[in-house]
Amino acid sequence: MISRFCLLFLLVFVVSKIQAVEDFNEENEVDDLDDLDFLDDLDLDLSPEELEYLENWAKEFED
C-alpha cells in the first residue's frame, strides 16, 4: 500500500515538473518575440523603416 502511494506521488511530481518546464519554455518563446515591444513605449519618434532596421538587426544579432 505504501509503495503504491509512493509511486503515485512520484508520478504526480514528475508530471507537474514536466508541465512547469513546458510552461516556462512557452513563456520564454513569447518573451523572445516581444523583446522590441518596449521601443513602441519610449516615444522615440522612430519611423517604420528605422523600427524595421532595429528589428532586423536584433534578429541577426540573435543568430
Curated annotation (Swiss-Prot):
This is Anionic peptide 10.1. GO terms for cellular component: extracellular region. The keyword Iron-sulfur does not apply. Residues 1-20 form the signal peptide. Its main location: secreted. It is found in: Secreted. Belongs to the non-disulfide-bridged peptide (NDBP) superfamily. Long chain multifunctional peptide (group 2) family. It comes from Lychas mucronatus (Chinese swimming scorpion). Expressed by the venom gland. The keyword Signal applies.
